[in-house]
Amino acid sequence: MKKHGVLNSEIAAVLASLGHTDTIVIADCGLPIPDGVKRIDLAVEIGKPSFLDVLQVVADDMAIEKVMLAEEVIINNAEVNKEVEMRLIEPAFEYVSHKEFKEHTKRAKAIIRTGEATPYANVILHAGVIF
């Protein structure tokens, strides 16, 4: 049995398979998941697991080069935006329109769906390298 890091076998496999600049998405329970993109559905009820809890576990186990969020999060969910910025202090941040954000999800290796039910609690993580 695995002792550290991500215990979810699907998430661990996706993280292990990422190459430089590949992307994964951590999403609230309302973000549309495009056809053809791997869905890892963790949602068990509204709010569980939370977006921030899942983000923290994934971020602890992933080399992240860039973080992308919808610019709407700045006004519509300032608390989540602030927490993401505080937890992920090293990668570059990019804000795009929610429409553009959804277009970028079509190229993700996987979308991890949480139980989060607050607006724009979604992030695209671009894989970095460990050297």
Curated annotation (Swiss-Prot):
Protein keywords: Carbohydrate metabolism, Cytoplasm, Isomerase
Keyword Cytoplasm in record: yes
Reactions that this protein is recorded to catalyse: beta-D-ribopyranose = beta-D-ribofuranose
Pathway(s) of this molecule: Carbohydrate metabolism; D-ribose degradation; D-ribose 5-phosphate from beta-D-ribopyranose: step 1/2
Residue sites binding substrate per the record: 28, 98, 120-122
Enzyme Commission number(s) of this protein: 5.4.99.62
Molecular function terms, GO-annotated: D-ribose pyranase activity; intramolecular lyase activity; monosaccharide binding
A Pfam cross-reference name: RbsD_FucU
Localization terms from the record: Cytoplasm
One Gene Ontology cellular component: cytosol
UniProt-annotated catalytic positions: 20 (proton donor)
Top EC class of this enzyme: isomerase
GO biological process, one term: D-ribose catabolic process
TM ranges: none
Gene3D superfamilies: RbsD-like domain
Role according to the record: Catalyzes the interconversion of beta-pyran and beta-furan forms of D-ribose.
Protein family according to the UniProt entry: Belongs to the RbsD / FucU family. RbsD subfamily.
Assembly and binders: Homodecamer.
Protein name as annotated: D-ribose pyranase
Gene: rbsD
